[in-house]
Amino acid sequence: IYPQIMPGARPSDEIIVLEDTDGDGRADKRTVFANDLLIPTAVLPDDRGGAYVANSSEVVHLSDTDGDGKADARRVVLAGFGTEDTHHILHTFMWGPDGAFYFNQSIYIHTHAETPHGVERLMGSGIWRLQTDTHKAEIVSRGLVNPWGHGFNRWGQSFATDGAGGNGINYAFRGS
């Protein structure tokens, strides 16, 4: 059974960093990078020592500002993502060849994401694109049932897999 978000539940999930400090191929150091999260389903490191995290109904940016390996700053980047079926909430975080941040949402989720540029709505599945410098969010592709895999080829073309549609690999282009 997938975890469901219970009203009033206290966030208790963590992001843990495992390290192999002695080079034997086994993790021997464990550091809690972030805690008090609620069903984090994706993590995307940035180039400044921080990370974007899918934290249930929101995308947050976590930063380690003092270099101790632990997030000590948390900023909500986008909020308003649906949580009706938690195994379909935000996932598959990745950087695109255009420098934008891409992520997926699956079916049975109803989102009204609040952005500085207005509300973006997605009722069901799709692929999102976020410009992290302007916080402009847009839906670039819709129609897959459960888009879990997403990638770009060397020419910047976008492809996604559908975990439930049986269609294999799909060309996911803007407006599709």
Predicted regions: what they are:
Residues 1-176:
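Beta-propeller blade termini and top-face loops
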